[in-house]
């Protein structure tokens, strides 16, 4: 059995009801073949009082009909966030638009929309800008990491995206703590465990 969705299940099933302390959300990532198993897991997590971030990996592997089926299941068990996941960093803007509008027109408005991207084609930043500019009736969550820290090609850079939001969306994020984190913590890690675009794979 693929371990992606089952990793850590023992901890989930052993967890007591959420008591208001510690992490309050659990991210459930799964491949298409694991959708029913993932939905059942999400229900159990919700029953224990945790928030659920529903992340069907490799969105591009789904047809419109299959993705609409996922949305229909989500409308029934009601995760806190339904994610568009670009696992291979291969989404172009037209792909982001396709999945966004399937969600926008069919997902319950009380469920937030998330976007989790990898940066293989160096499009995480432009795709995030595109999403942020769209009108939506949902709350929108866009994942990022400082200095793009992440597996393989890495993820959307927090320091770039918050500056973009400050300039275009009347946001008021302070970039100084982020830059200090880069200098003091993240950059030294990068020297020994690098990530990012590479022709050598």
Where are these regions (language model features)?
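Short hydrophobic alpha-helical runs that function as membrane-insertion/retention elements
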Residues: 27, 53-54, 140-144
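Single conserved hydrophobic/aromatic residue that forms the stacking wall/gate
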Residues: 2-13
